[in-house]
Design a protein with these regions (language model features):
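Ligand-binding pocket scaffold of soluble enzyme catalytic domains
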Residues: 42, 63, 153, 170, ...
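Boundary at the C-terminal end of the N-terminal hydrophobic targeting segment
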Residues: 19-23
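C-terminal capping alpha-helices of c-type cytochrome domains
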Residues: 132-147, 160-189
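The canonical Cys-X-X-Cys-His
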Residues: 47, 53-63, 138, 174, ...
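Gly/Gly-Pro-rich "capping" loops immediately C-terminal to redox-active cysteine motifs
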Residues: 65-140, 154-167, 197-200
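Positively charged n-region of N-terminal signal peptides that target proteins for export
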Residues: 1-4
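Electrostatic cytochrome c docking/interface patches
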Residues: 27-52, 64-70, 89-90, 132
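Bacterial N-terminal signal peptides
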Residues: 7-16
Length: 200
């Protein structure tokens, strides 16, 4: 009798496992990732995942318009606001305490708000981007929210306060990924202060 119970339990577990595996295989229709990390170096690959998950491409990569909406322009990864782009005018009376909080350019690389107009930085290793930066410069900037850790404040929508909680190891991995990108010459303009926003 004891053997029958043991074999019955074993049989039920086996059948249950098979049903579970079959159910999982047939009902799990999660889409496969559309892009897999391409960076060969393990630390840089981790940085690439952090950049992707952290939304760096949302603002720092110019977009191309597709039937599904704006998509990252993979030929200009993380190169920031295109220096040859024409900046649309900011409508008067649209941004304010009882109005909209911010407006974005069509490719989401320029933002207007109470702070003025900010432009997504070039994060590639070109001299017009992070070419002269060290890992320590990058870490200090991400920790303080100030350009090179002592310059002007990083403006919205840059969520530096979220990046500030990353470990030094994570920030070094992110910087290593940025250094692995194709250098793109693109001198991003300086921010435009609120009082000059009306002229644009």
């Amino acid at each position: 009798m004891k053997n029958i119970c043991v074999w019955s339990v074993f049989g039920l577990l086996t059948v249950g496992s098979a049903v579970q595996a079959q159910t999982t295989n047939t009902t799990d229709k999660s889409p496969a990732p559309t892009t897999m990390p391409k960076t060969a170096d393990k630390e840089a690959r981790r940085g690439e995942l952090l950049a992707t998950f952290g939304g760096c491409h949302d603002c720092h990569t110019p977009k191309v318009m597709t039937p599904k909406g704006p998509q990252p322009d993979t030929s200009r990864l993380l190169s920031g606001y295109p220096s040859n782009a024409s900046l649309p005018a900011v409508p008067q009376g649209v941004i304010g305490p009882t109005q909209w909080g911010a407006l974005a350019s069509n490719d989401l690389t320029a933002w207007a708000g109470p702070w003025g107009i900010s432009f997504a930085a070039n994060l590639t290793p070109d001299v017009t981007g992070l070419g002269h930066w060290t890992a320590q410069d990058f870490i200090h900037t991400m920790r303080t929210g100030k350009h090179l850790g002592m310059g002007r404040a990083l403006l919205p929508p840059m969520p530096w306060f979220d990046s500030a909680v990353l470990t030094d190891q994570d920030l070094k991995a992110l910087f290593k990924y940025l250094r692995s990108l194709k250098p793109i010459s693109n001198q991003v303009p300086q921010p435009i202060p609120p009082q000059a926003t009306a002229a644009h």
